[in-house]
Amino acid sequence: MDHYFDSMVADFVKKDFSDIGVDTRDLRKNITEMTKEAYHDAKPETCVLCKVPGKKFCNSHTIPQFVLRTIAQDGKLLDWNAILKSPVVDKEKGMKQAETFKIICTECDKKEFAEYENPSNYDGPVTQKMMQEITLKNLLNPYSKAIKDKKLFTSLLNASEHLLDSPLANLMFESLSVAYIKEKIKATETDIKDYTRQIHILYHGKPDQYDVIWKYRLNYTAPIAFQGEINLVTGFNHELINNIYDYDEKNKLKPIELCVFPFLNQTYILLFLAKRDRHLYRKFIKKFSKIDVNGKMKVILLIIFLYSDTFLVSPLLAEEVSKNPKVQKTFSILPDFAGGIPHGVEDVSMYVSQQAVKEYDLNSYQDVPDFLSEQYSIEHLKADDTENL
């Protein structure tokens, strides 16, 4: 589920429905079961890469397992729900559930990502092959989620049409907005088509050449891990880079690829993009290159917090993250404009894009906590934890 939808559901299940005879615990359980059922049914028939029938699907990790093991505590990790304190989704994840997907076979999982998932390869220059593998992996997880979300939102829409006489259903869909659900179905359909096209090009066609924007090695283990593609809406100059609220198939989003990989006693940060898209990010790259290292790390965190729900956090950092008002403020943005267009606006697309540029502006990076600094490293957090025993 996306930031906005999960927040709406979380707010909904916190309400008291005792006056209509509904137990909130049962409601939470029903929503969770509906989500799990929809997600379970949303599976491809064959591996989306090799297309060979009959092969067993692999429980693939978006972030390499050697990275996850570095920051896990007793095999556990925390995701963004730990920050939002969502009552709907489990906050703590085991290694087997940490940002995984099941849409490719075991053979493809082992073969197609072998170079970038080898930690020794990060001591030298990042190769085109490594960046190609990262880009492919970055497409597979959101592709899997788009398939699941389409199934979930379709189930919700069907429920809204068949439960019109239910007081609870009326309250629920008044809160969640049927218009929003329909818009999300349209968006996921567009995403699925676009991901399918991109995966086909990367796996079967001629892949892009990539340019590294920033590669940096920290001499300590950061407590946050991330790997994903980011469709930056804007940078530091109020320019529109990607209009993520234009669901027209002709609107092709141009992402940057971002990795934060904690290793033992070191952390690698990698930011790159397709060479053909560099001109779109010219202003962002120019400003980013002039920011000092500490500032760059804050920009990286702000981008992750604003755009993604797939980063993972060491339990050692849990209290700092969940109680930090600056993080809460960042997550409170969650821009989504379904049903929120002021009366009289004629050009809705332009209005939404202008609002998005304001909300996603990166100039507030200085307000982001220093969670990638040595102060919050795994080494320091473990030392502090030992002292408090």
Identify the residue ranges that each predicted region occupies.
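Generic surface-pattern signal
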Residues: 14, 18, 22, 136, ...
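Intrinsic-disorder-associated interaction segments
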Residues: 2, 6, 124, 129-132, ...
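Generic structural hydrophobic/aromatic packing signal, biased to beta-strands
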Residues: 47-50, 135, 226, 269-271
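An N-terminal structural lobe/cap that precedes and organizes the functional/catalytic core
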Residues: 2-124
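Internal, well-ordered alpha/beta segment that forms a basic, Gly-enriched binding/recognition surface
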Residues: 76-181
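Charge-dense, low-complexity intrinsically disordered regions
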Residues: 184-389
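Generic detector of ordered, mature protein regions
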Residues: 69-76, 80-81, 117-118, 143-156, ...
